[in-house]
Amino acid sequence: MAQAVATLEQAHGAGEVGHEAEHADHPHSSTGLDSRKLLMWLFLASDCMFFGSLIAMYMIYRGDAERMYLAGQGSGPVPHEILDIPYTSISAFVLLMSSLTMVLALASIQRGNQRGLRVWLGATAALGLVFLGGQFYEFTSFYHEGLGLTTNIFGNAFFTLTGFHGAHVTIGVVWLISLIVVSLRGGVRQDQSLNVEIAGLYWHFVDIVWIVIFTLVYLIPYDKVETVGQQAEQGFRLIGLG
């Protein structure tokens, strides 16, 4: 009887040690959400406001640039003269497909499939690089057509908005490649899939932001942009930013 009690105590002690180790590997906040995941959500929320401000400023400046063009004023090309919707649609499709491969990467590590993880992370990073290559080509094409960062207010707003998004994609690609390297060294176990999930949250956010940018920058016609831009300008004035 005493031996059975001792065995139960040992098992209970081992369970407590394992439970403590699990909490050490995955620290949780008071909300029950992993603290790293919570921090990522907070970062994405602040980044969402950042991009919202950039998009609103773009809408205002694009409307101003088009009005100056119609009045025979201003310098350099304006949106309807230079934006290539078919070409950018391909880039948008490439980035959207990278969200699918990111989901497959997470599913692979949750099944303990290290090779699948590396394959799909590599595919996601490759699609990100293709998107960045397309963005670089677009930037150089615009430059050769006379549109630069300081050419006019449209150029300034366009390159600032899309440039910051491109920087976010670049950070994401570097993150994905680092996960591949860690996986090759045996550092991403099945019970550490949260590391991949957090990277996936960031990557999906970058994709969603591009959908918004693509819709507002490339697809919405000038008269609609002017209306939205005027509303955004009025909003900035109401909160004291205009």
Residue ranges of model-derived segments:
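...captures the hydrophobic TM-helix bundle architecture rather than a specific catalytic motif
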Residues: 1-242
